[in-house]
Amino acid sequence: MTKIVRFGVSVEEDLLENFDKIIENKGYNSRSEAIRDLMRDYIIKEKWNIKSEKVAGSISLIYEHDVYGLSEKLTDIQHHYHDVIISTLHVHLDEKNCMEVILVRGKVEKIKKLYNEISSLKWVRHTNISITDII
């Protein structure tokens, strides 16, 4: 286990009051837990700006499955990025729409390229990416 270090933080009273309300609503047991989570999130966001960093995450997308050639194009793109794709989940939302969740692991630069290729396709209605640090 990593050594725990104590440090002090000075903030405005109203900022702390608002923070305390939020962490109480989220169910945190202490400010320390909430601050650790915020620090981790900040570090992950910064890693997203460094092309060579390794991350893991998911890309989710919703698209119309009956658009001619779209499913094949998505499959081709995924085969091209087989080295960063861990797994794919495909769900039929209704008669017209499908959702895919693509689990990824690898360098930021390649995952960004994959995400951009998918999100720029016509008839892909929505895309979202969520990343985390590989610990």
Swiss-Prot record:
What InterPro entries does this protein's entry cite? Acetolactate_synth/TF_NikR_C, ACT-like_dom_sf, Arc_rbn_hlx_hlx, CopG, CopG/NikR_regulator, Ni_resp_reg_NikR, Ribbon_hlx_hlx, TF_NikR_Ni-bd_C
The protein's GO terms of the molecular function aspect are: DNA binding; DNA-binding transcription factor activity; nickel cation binding
Name of protein: Putative nickel-responsive regulator
Annotated binding of Ni(2+), by residue: 79, 90, 92, 98
The taxonomic lineage of its organism, from the top, reads: Bacteria, Pseudomonadati, Dictyoglomota, Dictyoglomia, Dictyoglomales
Task: Please indicate which superkingdom the organism of origin belongs to.
Answer: Bacteria
Explain the purpose of this protein: Transcriptional regulator.
Q: Which organism is it from?
A: Dictyoglomus thermophilum (strain ATCC 35947 / DSM 3960 / H-6-12)
Q: How is the cofactor bound?
A: Binds 1 nickel ion per subunit.
> What Gene Ontology terms for biological process does this UniProt record contain?
response to nickel cation
Please verify whether the record's keywords include Signal. Answer: no
User: Required cofactors, per record?
Assistant: Ni(2+)
Q: Which PANTHER family match?
A: NICKEL-RESPONSIVE REGULATOR
- Has UniProt tagged this entry with the keyword DNA-binding? yes
Keyword vocabulary terms for this entry = DNA-binding, Metal-binding, Nickel, Transcription, Transcription regulation
Family classification: Belongs to the transcriptional regulatory CopG/NikR family.
